[in-house]
Amino acid sequence: MSDVDPQGPFAETDTRPVHDTTPVVPHDVADPWHEFEGWGLVAAQNDIVETPFRRFRRRFVRRRAALVALAFIILIVLVAIFAPLVAPYDPLEQDLRNTLQGPSGSHWLGTDELGRDVLSRMIFGARVSLLAAVQAVGIALVLGVPPGLIAGYFGGWVDTGVSRINDTVMSFPPLLLAIAIVGVFGPNLRNAMLAVGIIFAPRFLRLMRASVMAVKEETFIEASRSIGTPTGRILRTRVLPNATSPMVVQISLSLGFAMLAEASLSFLGLGVQPPEASWGAMVGRAYRFLDQSPTLVLFPGLAIVLAVLAFNVLGDGLRDSVGREVRGA
């Protein structure tokens, strides 16, 4: 037996206790990835996962026109909420000695045919117009989204039947259909917005149906079916959240068109009834005095144009920013 150390002169000295039998791992054959563990930790900390909401926010803030439109809409909402605090006069207070007056220091936007302050009536009219638009769009969502969800997911004869009914409703001229509905139920704001909601419902139905038909082919929907998830739960927690992105855009656009529809029906005397004020009703009553006081039509008409434009610009910004990126777990 040779006394020569087989590991040669470069062997490491084993200074462990005699009872320690753990094998010695030389430094030159230690874990080569140990020194990179810190790098991976730093990379994980610096790698910020961009959620769908963060991605949407990043895209939306780049669209200046949409931000301006959103700020204008928020301003209108705040004015409508705090109308009693903002309005300088009671919107129903009459002053028959100062009728059809132009803008002045005491009445910034003038007075109407009964001497009522136009600015105060516009401020309170903003509340009525906004609430009317929200009511109409809410009715459209309730009437349009559930049938579109069911038709798009199940297809077959269900889809065919729902689509035929939807096409029949869309075949009627919108204004004539609204006039007919208001004529049956009576001329007031609630019935007018019911009519507008019925008119808008087919658009929401078609959009939801198309979105659901695209979503139901995704792999996570197939996975939910394969593990036996109930259909109702799939529709509620998987399909609906992933099909609502286009609806956000449609809601914004429809709010603007609903305000315009309310103004049109009120102009015809089928919406807001005197003495309540809305922008459309103010234009309808002021039209008779166009030659005596042009500003009486100008200011509420301009408010309608700007509000509808703001909702449309906001809808365009949302359309460019939002994406169908929600997923079911």
Please identify what each model-predicted range represents.
Residues M170, I181-F185, V196, S211-V212, ...:
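Glycine-rich helix-loop "coupling/hinge" segments at transmembrane-helix boundaries
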Residues M1-V145, L149-I150, W157, L175, ...:
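Gly/Trp-centered helix-boundary motif
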Residues R63-A66, V128, T160, D167-P174, ...:
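Membrane-embedded alpha-helical bundles that form the substrate/pore pathway
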Residues W108, D112, V118, I139-L143, ...:
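Generic hydrophobic transmembrane alpha-helix motif, especially the helices
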Residues I76, F82, L100, S104, ...:
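Hydrophobic aliphatic residues
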Residues F82-V86, Y153-F154, A180, V184-F185, ...:
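Helix-loop junctions at the membrane-solvent interface of multi-pass transporters
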